[in-house]
Amino acid sequence: MWRGLPALALAALLLLGRAPAGRAAACEPVRIPLCKPLPWNMTKMPNHLHHSTQANAVLAMEQFEGLLGTNCSPDLLFFLCAMYAPICTIDFQHEPIKPCKSVCERARAGCEPVLIRYRHAWPESLACDELPLYDRGVCISPEAIVTAEGADFPMDSNNGNCRGTGIERCKCKPIKATQKTYLRNNYNYVIRAKVKEVKTKCHDVTAVVEVKEILKSSLVNIPKDTVNLYTNSGCLCPPLSANEEYIIMGYEDEERSRLLLVEGSIAEKWKDRLGKKVKRWDQKLRHLGKGKGEPGQSDSALKTGKPGNARQTRS
């Protein structure tokens, strides 16, 4: 049934003891197409989202197909399947195993900026707060599953988070600052900033910049001070070099009051002429009625990964 069982989780399951025979619900083969490639092949209904059948779970998971297509997080599919088609062990536990809190947090950190871009929020039903920590309960995470290839990166056994990674090959597709791009992408913020440093922690890269001038802002307050620009992957795209001054155009995470530097953002070496152009472009954008917050997207934006019929533009 298992194609790899974490030793720690197995030991913890054994400590729980076997469920009484009368209460042990039957495990069933995973029939959800998106979850079949995952390292378990048996599940149990109802799942963690209270779907009584896998057919219901399939319909509910369809809304995430577009988000999965963006490759916003390597943990998203694992997390969704652990919620919608949870691992079931016949002998050791009468309740399906939940994903670890750290898995949820990594998936959310990578994909929530994409949802925000299309005026969606991370679903409350997938909140990370109530999920178990790696060292305080039985839970499952990708790095805990033993495979023939071994772990992709060393893990901290105390919390399930990585201690370090190998060099990640980043392929950034440059986006040139033009009026057409500016009007199409409708950035939340535009700043002139000097890069102080680029910090890397596990899969997260953060650029620390000193804001020199604010050309555009939206709902997140931007001080003329040192601020962090957050990414949603282990790559800094567009790339930034320390001690260089840039004009940076990006998006924001209103809920966490964060400025984001994600796919579709622009960073070019600062030139006074370019700064003046951007101010003119923004005036035109406001004249077109796009410079402020637009109505929310239709639900199809989440499913397809593209905006609906509202005026929100795509990158």
Curated annotation (Swiss-Prot):
Keyword hit for Translocase: no
GO molecular function: Wnt-protein binding
Transmembrane segments: none
Localization (cell): Secreted
Ranges where the FZ domain occurs: 22-142
Function according to Swiss-Prot or TrEMBL: Soluble frizzled-related proteins (sFRPS) function as modulators of Wnt signaling through direct interaction with Wnts. They have a role in regulating cell growth and differentiation in specific cell types. SFRP3/FRZB appears to be involved in limb skeletogenesis. Antagonist of Wnt8 signaling. Regulates chondrocyte maturation and long bone development.
Name of the protein this chain belongs to: Secreted frizzled-related protein 3
Native source species: Gallus gallus
Gene label: FRZB
